[in-house]
């Protein structure tokens, strides 16, 4: 057996929830969590893996509550997209401080703040070893950041969408509420739909399924889990066609 194992993936799309950046704060960005995540991404870059990142915005803004209170959903979603840009700026800065070359691309033009999203340029940057952070979701309201992660993953021809969450995989029930919940190591797209498991919203999930994009759900708050995932070790839950 080789003493220097090769990564299981060459190019990945890492989806982080905005909540993952909060740490124990309850709101905003925990600098310690941000720096740890930047270090974990740096490890992947040093392994020669090409990394695209999509971050949610739920730590800074959640449109659902305001929509229920009467705010126009489109306005709420635009605010949510801007929250993902703020998280993207924080992540880019953390990567730069960790001496990792990173570019931030936004689906909404924000001249002087970050680059506009450009598919060909994103792939060129990934090939040159830069981390590319995709912000502002898909640029459209009514689309989640999970949809953005699957869309960007498909566009950049990533081999997998890694969904970093607060639990270490997909369970038969909510493990926070039900101690009897069983963790799955592998699932097919069909099994997820049949069992009505909550992996991501249906639009995002069916997009991944239709384009045969594997999804791997793991706990981003567990130190070393991201590296284990990309090295093909047993970590999290893999969802694919067969």
From Swiss-Prot:
Positions annotated to bind ATP: 15-18, 58, 62, 165, 171, 174
Organism in which the protein naturally occurs: Shewanella oneidensis (strain ATCC 700550 / JCM 31522 / CIP 106686 / LMG 19005 / NCIMB 14063 / MR-1)
An example Gene Ontology biological process: UDP biosynthetic process
Pfam families: AA_kinase
Protein name in UniProt: Uridylate kinase
Positions with a binding annotation for UMP: 57, 77, 138-145
Catalytic activity: UMP + ATP = UDP + ADP
InterPro entries xref list: AceGlu_kinase-like_sf, Asp/Glu/Uridylate_kinase, Uridylate_kinase, Uridylate_kinase_bac
Keywords in alphabetical order: Allosteric enzyme, ATP-binding, Cytoplasm, Kinase, Nucleotide-binding, Pyrimidine biosynthesis, Transferase
GO MF: ATP binding; UMP kinase activity
EC number per UniProt: 2.7.4.22
Involved in allosteric activation by GTP as annotated region, ranges: 23-28
Family designation: Belongs to the UMP kinase family.
Cell compartments where the protein resides: Cytoplasm
Activity regulation details: Allosterically activated by GTP. Inhibited by UTP.
Cellular-component GO terms for this entry: cytosol
Keyword Cytoplasm on entry: yes
Pathway note: Pyrimidine metabolism; CTP biosynthesis via de novo pathway; UDP from UMP (UMPK route): step 1/1
The keyword Cytoplasm belongs to this UniProt entry's keyword annotation: yes
């Amino acid at each position: 057996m080789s003493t220097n194992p090769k990564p299981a993936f060459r190019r990945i799309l890492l989806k982080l929830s905005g909540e993952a950046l909060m740490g124990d704060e309850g709101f905003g960005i925990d600098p310690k969590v941000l720096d740890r995540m930047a270090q974990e991404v740096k490890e992947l870059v040093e392994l020669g893996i090409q990394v695209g990142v999509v971050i949610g915005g739920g730590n800074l803004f959640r449109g659902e509550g305001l929509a229920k209170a009467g705010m126009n959903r489109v306005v709420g979603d635009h605010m949510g997209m801007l929250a993902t840009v703020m998280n993207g700026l924080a992540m880019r800065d953390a990567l730069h401080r960790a001496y990792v070359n990173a570019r931030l691309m936004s689906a909404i033009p924000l001249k002087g703040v970050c680059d506009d999203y450009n598919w060909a340029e994103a792939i060129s940057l990934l090939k040159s070893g830069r981390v590319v952070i995709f912000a502002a979701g898909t640029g459209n309201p009514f689309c989640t950041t999970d949809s953005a992660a699957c869309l960007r993953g498909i566009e950049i021809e990533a081999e997998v969408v890694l969904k970093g969450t607060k639990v270490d995989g997909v369970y038969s029930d909510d493990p926070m509420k039900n101690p009897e919940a069983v963790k799955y190591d592998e699932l097919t797209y069909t099994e997820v739909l049949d069992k009505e498991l909550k992996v991501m919203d249906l639009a995002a999930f069916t997009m991944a399924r239709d384009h045969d994009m594997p999804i791997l759900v793991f706990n981003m708050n567990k130190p070393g889990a991201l590296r284990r995932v990309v090295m093909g070790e047993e970590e999290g839950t893999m969802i694919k066609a067969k």
